[in-house]
């Protein structure tokens, strides 16, 4: 896929049974995948390890970078097991008892749920949703002594084993990081040098402080992405965003907790706030859901993806479409095409003005230079921006101002003695930039013996050659470079040789 067709918006793919072989992962990388999501709600460590090894092999084979995201299971509430393991038929108007004794095998009269405080936390008149909201149970009475809740079924449906449960409007007394999550992060995530953790059911800013404490020295190299999936999280959104490195709009559980007709607004407001803080945001859940079975998305899905791009999302995400669908590669290609089309309609000048309007005054020197570089690129009709960076923060600030052209983020190693220690100083910032719209990271090996000025010239030359190779610019084009030399930071307009 030629580089000009790759959208600026990044695509996150969930790897699963349909997409974990080396050839398939290679296809997804070529089609436009930038981040691979490992969903720890399912699968053993061995299973995920095999998938990760295959991903790394595919990255080597294609020479493409891909970030690794661990998505935690979080404090889920589930229904229990059923007699003989057979689904039960629930009829509208039928009454049923919910027990909090999880050893109970359920039937048509009694089922169990994994949340011990259910009888204390719900009140008559409230609704309990099961199996992604396909079953709605109205609470009639609660027996706190026995830990049981009497409900009436609001609709007719089949209930299988271990289905997810939502309690709209209830402040659930469960930790954001369960013991399983801690184990997943420390025993699988950290040793495998993952790039980011998507935290399920974040409810307040202090949740993130605890996770950083848990990560210790690794907190520097692992980004924390918050998923707000209930009313408490929505209420504390600003506090959560300040404490997060990135954000995911997980519309699935959110759609159970807040009225479905308000989801569009929640999405727009959250993206808007993330954009102004320069924090990357992922829009997720059911984006091309019908492509699990069909080679074409519905018109509504195509419009949904395009609208997320117009709203300002940095990434769009595929879940079941790539994990278990019949057309994983086609889903990514379709998504990329829709993103390219949506991006071509944006008024980048207007977006720049809007972000400048909301920028803090006074701006930090670095941010002031980043926004000036974007303005320079626009007025000089440059086709590419090149940012030389070590930790990646300069390139990320440039991306915040949303130039209409790609930003080549050239990650230069920090020289420690004579060896280049890529692992600690470099690959992480390059992969982290894979969740920012418009950033194209590239690793530059550089020559250890050159002086600062020579090495800057060499790096710029390398960057323009790379840009030409990837069809981001051509001979005679203007490009704007932003780099540090000595104590000065320089914005330079170059002509591609």
Swiss-Prot record:
- Cellular localization per UniProt: Cytoplasm, Cytosol
Family under the similarity heading? Belongs to the pyruvate kinase family.
Q: Name one Pfam family in it.
A: PK_C
Entry protein name: Probable pyruvate kinase, cytosolic isozyme
UniProt: ATP binding residues: 39-42, 78, 163
Report the cofactors.
Answer: Mg(2+); K(+)
Cite the entry's keywords alphabetically.
ATP-binding, Cytoplasm, Glycolysis, Kinase, Magnesium, Metal-binding, Nucleotide-binding, Potassium, Pyruvate, Transferase
Instruction: Extract the InterPro entries matched here.
Output: Pyr_Knase (IPR001697), Pyrv/PenolPyrv_kinase-like_dom (IPR015813), Pyrv_kinase-like_dom_sf (IPR040442), Pyrv_Knase-like_insert_dom_sf (IPR011037), Pyrv_Knase_AS (IPR018209), Pyrv_Knase_brl (IPR015793), Pyrv_Knase_C (IPR015795), Pyrv_Knase_C_sf (IPR036918)
The yes or no answer to whether the keyword Magnesium is present is yes
Question: Key word Metal-binding present in the record?
Answer: yes
Which species is the source of this protein?
Arabidopsis thaliana
Q: Which residues are listed for K(+) binding in this entry?
A: 39, 41, 71-72
Q: What is its EC number?
A: 2.7.1.40
For this chain, one GO molecular function annotation is: pyruvate kinase activity
The annotated subunit structure for this chain is: Homotetramer.
Q: Which GO terms describe its cellular component?
A: cytosol
- Which reaction does this enzyme catalyse, per its entry? pyruvate + ATP = phosphoenolpyruvate + ADP + H(+)
Q: What does this protein do?
A: Key regulatory enzyme of the glycolytic pathway that catalyzes the final step of glycolysis, converting ADP and phosphoenolpyruvate (PEP) to ATP and pyruvate by essentially irreversible transphosphorylation.
**Superkingdom classification of source:** Eukaryota
Residues annotated to bind substrate: 37, 227, 252-253, 285
Note the site residues: Transition state stabilizer. 227
């Amino acid at each position: 896929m030629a580089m000009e067709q790759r959208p600026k918006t990044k695509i996150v793919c969930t790897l699963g049974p349909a997409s974990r072989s080396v050839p398939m992962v290679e296809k997804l990388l070529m089609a436009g995948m930038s981040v691979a999501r490992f969903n720890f709600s399912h699968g053993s460590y061995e299973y995920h390890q095999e998938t990760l090894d295959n991903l790394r092999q595919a990255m080597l084979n294609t020479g493409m970078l891909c970030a690794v995201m661990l998505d935690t299971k979080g404090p889920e509430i589930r229904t229990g097991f059923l007699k003989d393991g057979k689904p039960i038929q629930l009829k509208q108007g039928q009454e049923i008892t919910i027990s909090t004794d999880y050893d109970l095998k359920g039937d048509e009269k009694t089922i169990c749920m994994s949340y011990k405080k259910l009888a204390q936390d719900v009140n008559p008149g409230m609704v309990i949703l099961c199996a992604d909201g396909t079953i709605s149970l109205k609470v009639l009475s609660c027996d706190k002594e026995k830990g049981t809740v009497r409900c009436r079924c609001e609709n007719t449906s089949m209930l299988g084993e271990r289905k997810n449960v939502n309690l709209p409007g209830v402040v659930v007394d469960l930790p954001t990081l369960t013991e399983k999550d801690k184990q997943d992060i420390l025993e699988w995530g950290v040793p495998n040098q993952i790039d980011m953790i998507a935290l399920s059911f974040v409810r307040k800013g202090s949740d993130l402080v605890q996770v950083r404490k848990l990560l210790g020295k690794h907190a520097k190299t692992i980004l924390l992405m918050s998923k707000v999936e209930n009313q408490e999280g929505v209420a504390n959104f600003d506090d959560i965003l300040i404490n997060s490195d990135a954000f995911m709009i997980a519309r699935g559980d959110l759609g159970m907790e807040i009225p479905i007709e308000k989801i569009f607004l929640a999405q727009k407001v959250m993206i808007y706030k993330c954009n102004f803080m320069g924090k990357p945001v992922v829009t997720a859940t059911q984006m091309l859901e019908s492509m699990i079975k069909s080679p074409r998305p519905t018109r509504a899905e195509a419009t949904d993806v395009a609208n997320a791009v117009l709203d300002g999302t940095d990434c769009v995400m595929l879940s079941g479409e790539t994990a278990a669908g019949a057309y994983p590669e086609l889903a990514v290609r379709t998504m990329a095409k829709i993103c390219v089309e949506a991006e071509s309609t944006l008024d980048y000048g207007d977006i720049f003005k809007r972000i400048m309007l909301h920028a803090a005054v006074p701006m930090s020197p670095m941010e002031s230079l980043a926004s000036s570089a974007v303005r320079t690129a626009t007025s000089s009709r440059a086709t590419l921006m090149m940012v030389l960076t070590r930790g990646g923060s300069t390139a990320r600030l440039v991306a915040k101002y949303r130039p209409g052209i790609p930003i080549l983020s050239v990650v230069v190693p920090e020289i420690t003695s004579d060896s280049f220690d890529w692992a600690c100083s470099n690959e992480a910032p390059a992969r982290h930039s894979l969740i920012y719209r418009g950033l194209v990271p590239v690793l530059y090996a550089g020559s250890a013996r050159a002086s600062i000025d020579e090495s800057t010239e060499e790096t710029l030359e390398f960057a323009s050659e790379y840009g030409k190779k990837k069809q981001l610019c051509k001979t005679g084009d203007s490009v704007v470079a932003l780099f540090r030399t000595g104590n000065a930071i320089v914005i330079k307009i170059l002509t591609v040789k």
